[in-house]
Regions:
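Active-site phosphate-binding and catalytic loops of NTP-dependent enzymes
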Residues: 70-79, 124-143, 229, 329-334, ...
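P-loop NTP-binding catalytic core
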Residues: 97-200
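Conserved lysine of the Walker
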Residues: 214
Length: 417
């Protein structure tokens, strides 16, 4: 009997008995069925010369247990890779891996067909309560138990005819400003400045393109928050580690509506709830819509805050904040929106620079390349005061005192002295 025939026999038995592999008892029954099938094969092997060897049967048993009871051999290989920052699955045999330095096609990992790929996605989603991928919900976004972010879709939403998936993992290798300095993400002087900004309660926006290190930097900044502060974190998909790391910190995670009738819980609502939790500081993981105005309102009422936003530069990020504030439903004009955005004090831009075509590595290391103060507005444009110049380890203080210079001195930022 071929390995595939053995697999089909076990799967038929599981379907026949309606075994629920998401339950502990169901997985125990699957374990027994696998062992019973392999025991029968060993007996058949003793009765005649045809058949697999014991070593092959043992290997097949491990594969069946991985695929039917665990996450599967492919999933285990992917999630165990210490250098992979993102997996991009464009079909059963079109799999790409982003190591941070380059994006390359993987040849050693493949699914047999769409059916096995669907089973892989469903097995991952079994770990996430309330998430499923089917005809009713053909696209999902979910946070896996290890913190990875999974986005997936199936046909017809996936127009290439196959299930597709992206699994983004956070593997910059740093959780503090000191560790980011060791990775040349920023200079020691810039780290000291940002730490002082956090301790002084300044309002900070971290910006950059996709996968530029925004979430990692926001996490590191959060670790600089004084222990006596109460912090509330609001996210569309929980990625920040601060509720686990800070003693007086709680986290909210938005929830989409479900086909079972569960109502959606939006990020805008959660920021409103956060204001009623007696916070000293509110952190919104990323501003992309109506939650922007809710955050700006919290800043205007005296709460310190931080967030991240997509932006090709500090100025572009602030323009996006204005745009998002205008789409929030609040009846305000552009100049009024800019006035709300002026509650932001410091903008930090992260980058993941591309190398020239033909280079061995597609990308240079992630780094901060801009730290500015939002000092006001001229008409419909924000007025920016550059505070640091350079990139990564070469970021240097320009000696320009921001409006909150006195607070920075009290927080111990010495270059202002």
């Amino acid at each position: 009997m071929s390995p595939e025939a053995i697999r089909r026999e076990v799967e038929r038995a599981l379907v026949s008995e309606q075994v629920d592999l998401t339950s502990e008892s169901g997985r125990a029954r699957a374990e027994r069925l696998i062992e019973e099938t392999l025991t029968g094969l060993r007996a058949a092997e003793l009765a005649g010369p045809e058949g697999a060897r014991d070593g092959r049967l043992a290997e097949l048993g491990r594969e069946l247990r991985d695929d039917l009871i665990g996450l599967g051999a492919i999933a285990e290989a992917m999630l165990a890779d210490p250098d992979a920052q993102e997996w991009m699955i464009n079909g059963p045999r079109r799999i790409f891996r982003d190591s941070g330095e380059r994006i390359e096609r993987v040849t050693g990992i493949a699914f047999a067909d769409d059916r096995q790929l669907r089973a892989f996605l469903e097995r991952l989603l079994e770990q996430v309560e309330g998430k499923r991928l089917d005809r009713i919900t053909p696209r999902i976004e979910a946070r896996l138990p290890d913190g990875s972010r999974m986005t997936a879709a199936i046909p017809p939403v996936s127009s290439n005819g196959h299930p597709i998936c992206s699994i983004r993992r956070f593997r910059l290798g740093a959780s503090s400003l000191a560790e980011l300095e060791q990775l040349d993400f920023l200079s020691g002087q810039a780290a000291a400045f940002l730490s002082a900004c956090v301790r002084a309660g300044r309002n900070i926006v971290v910006c950059g393109r996709v996968s530029s290190g925004k979430t990692t930097l926001l996490n590191a900044l959060g670790r600089e928050i004084p222990a006596q502060e109460r912090v509330v974190v609001c996210e569309s998909s929980a990625e920040l580690q601060l509720p686990r790391l800070l003693a007086n910190c709680i986290g909210y995670e938005a929830r989409p509506g479900s086909v079972d009738g569960l109502p959606a819980v939006g990020l805008e609502e959660l920021v409103g709830d956060a204001l009623r939790m007696n916070p000293d500081r509110i952190i919104v993981g990323e501003c992309r819509g109506a939650e922007t105005m809710a955050l700006l309102w919290s800043l205007a009422t005296g709460h310190a805050g931080m967030t991240s936003i997509h932006g090709e530069s500090a100025e572009h990020a602030l323009k996006n904040l204005v745009r998002f504030a205008l789409t929030s439903g609040a009846r305000i004009e552009a100049e009024q929106a800019l006035d709300w955005v002026s509650e932001v004090e410091v903008v930090v831009h992260c980058d993941r620079p591309r190398n020239p075509p033909g280079s061995e590595h597609g990308f240079r290391p992630r780094q901060i390349d801009e730290i500015v103060e939002l000092s006001g507005a001229e008409g419909s444009r924000p007025t920016l005061n550059p505070l640091f110049e350079g990139e990564g380890r070469s970021l240097a203080w320009l000696g320009v005192a921001p409006r909150f210079a006195a607070e920075l001195r009290q927080a111990g930022f010495e270059p202002l002295a």
